[in-house]
Regions:
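Phosphate-coordination loops involved in phosphoryl transfer and adenosine-cofactor binding
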Residues: 1
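Aromatic- and Gly/Pro-rich donor/ligand-binding loops
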Residues: 4-15, 19-20, 24-162
């Protein structure tokens, strides 16, 4: 087996996502000599974790003002997670769109999707996204092997799964 790409939630600033991505990378490396986490970080996902919001409005301004007392803690947390990602993950270059993923997938003989709730359109990262750009659909035309590893659909209905 050649190089294996891993498509997962790896860049959320929470311990669960970071550790599941690391565990998935370790598990896949048992079956593939070379693994790489595809650094797919959609703008909608990045905006959840940004320190400085670019959308304007009274509500956003008020929320930002309320965050000022903990700004330095939030910044420190973000920096620590980014350091962890860069130190422990074997990452591809950053991909912000499905097209970016398409442009690099020829380097992989297989792509593993998972683990975590990569198919749960009710997750925080996916609620604001166009569902057709999400993980199962990004790989729809991938010519290599597509593997799902410990993926969860959470509480999606049968009707939602037909999408």
């Amino acid at each position: 087996m050649g190089k294996t790409g891993i498509l997962t939630y790896h860049s959320a600033y929470n311990y669960g996502s970071a550790l599941q991505a690391l565990a998935t990378q370790k598990a896949v490396s048992c079956f593939s000599t070379e693994t790489e986490i595809i650094n797919y970080r959609m703008n909608s996902q990045k905006s959840i974790y940004t320190l400085y919001r670019t959308s304007f409005g009274l509500k956003t301004f008020a929320k930002d003002i309320l965050q000022l007392p903990i700004h330095s803690k939030r910044k420190q947390r973000a920096e620590k997670f980014e350091t962890f990602f860069n130190q422990f993950f074997n990452l591809s270059e950053e991909c912000a769109t499905p097209e970016d993923v398409y442009n690099i997938w020829n380097r992989y003989s297989a792509i593993v999707s998972g683990s975590d709730q990569i198919w749960n359109k009710h997750s925080l990262e996916l609620e604001t996204c166009d569902w057709k750009y999400m993980y199962p659909y990004v790989l729809k035309d991938f010519p290599g092997r597509k593997i799902s590893y410990a993926s969860s659909i959470s509480n999606m209905t049968d009707e939602e799964l037909k999408m």
